Amino acid sequence: FGLQYVVIRKPKPMDTATLNYSWQMNGTNAFSIYTNATDTIDDKSARQAVSSVLRFLTRMGILKYNNHSGYIASVINEHELLAVKTYDGGFYRRLKSPGDPVFHGDIIGEVIDPFEGFVKSQIVSQTDGIVFFAHTAPTVMGNQVVYKIIRRMHE
């Protein structure tokens, strides 16, 4: 597909009811492609997803289409992603987006008190790496995962 990352994860109970899962259990190669947004339209990541499918179909000989070769994917196991959680609930201000580099100690988000409007807590990166997932909804609860970071292994 030529995407930057391939994430390997164990199926969750919800996955077992999907057509993709059923196909895989019956020996068919099936893939899922996810973009940056699932509840809104993100034009940039949607174009990237379309390009990746066209690239795959071209490589399989199903389609003739001229496009760039894409990335050599980094394979990541989901359990290797560092989950960053909130301490408090409230309004959420995201300061970093997927693909942004972060460093240990960077302030990457804030939780704002919904009644008084002050910053209740700051969300701090616990490692050097690249943001893989960033929460987008305007509110958060305490102890909620708001970022997943790919840890930087070396320079």
How does the language model describe each region?
Residues 1-155:
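Structured catalytic-domain cores with a bias toward divalent-metal coordination
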